Amino acid sequence: MRYAVICMLLLAASGCTAARQAPSPEPGLVPPPVVTTPEEKAENPGSLFSDENADLLYADYRARRVGDIVLINIVENSKAENKASTSTNKESTGEYGVSSFFDRSKVGIIPGQTLLSGRTGDVPLLKFSSVSDFSGDGETTRENTVTATIAARVTRVLPGGLMQVEGSRETRVNEETQIVTVSGLVRTSDVADDNSVMSTQMADARISYYGKGVISDKQRVGWFTRLMDNLWPF
């Protein structure tokens, strides 16, 4: 019976804990977009010259159309530091008294009986003293480095020379899967001669690097430990 009561108390306490925000789902692999190329009718069917291969000798192979491939060089280095210090001190004292009450040196309700011994001018009716001190320090440091190269597809061409690109790469080694996804906006002028662009030149960039497998499972906290963290009040 005692164990049943303890279990009921634990369940009731777990219901009172604040609900944690559900983690955002991990981004999956981006499916390839459907690209339809309209058929162009030749103006002169009997001619040996074709506009489709007119620029093969001097063509620019940098990505600029929907469905083209562009290399994204992911080089992300970020470091943030924050430090705060607070110190406060407050001290106050005070005394309140009555020197005379209707020309009497003693204060009392019944004649001959006093509430205070001695003269009221010598003994204060109220005396207080207060001291408050506070000191707090906080410091945080975070550093992140991601380096990778991934091929992305142009999924949309926007006005102003912008291209929306999306790409993903999945690598599986010994039952451990590493997934890299990238998406964002790239200017056609930022694409280098080798058809590559730096991730630092992307706008609205979203880069994810995560894994699935035995190693990732070992790095997670167990469900019972997370439950006790929610129930433990201290």
Swiss-Prot record:
PROSITE patterns: PROKAR_LIPOPROTEIN. A lipid is attached at C16 (N-palmitoyl cysteine). It is a lipid-anchor. Residues 1-15 form the signal peptide. It comes from the Bacteria. The keyword Signal applies. Keywords: Bacterial flagellum, Cell outer membrane, Lipoprotein, Membrane, Palmitate, Signal. It is found in: Cell outer membrane; Bacterial flagellum basal body. A lipid is attached at C16 (S-diacylglycerol cysteine). GO terms for molecular function: cytoskeletal motor activity. One of its GO terms (cellular component) is cell outer membrane. GO terms for biological process: bacterial-type flagellum-dependent cell motility. Belongs to the FlgH family. The basal body constitutes a major portion of the flagellar organelle and consists of four rings (L,P,S, and M) mounted on a central rod. HAMAP family: FlgH (MF_00415). Assembles around the rod to form the L-ring and probably protects the motor/basal body from shearing forces during rotation. This is Flagellar L-ring protein. It comes from Oleidesulfovibrio alaskensis (strain ATCC BAA-1058 / DSM 17464 / G20). The lineage of its organism: Bacteria, Pseudomonadati, Thermodesulfobacteriota, Desulfovibrionia, Desulfovibrionales.
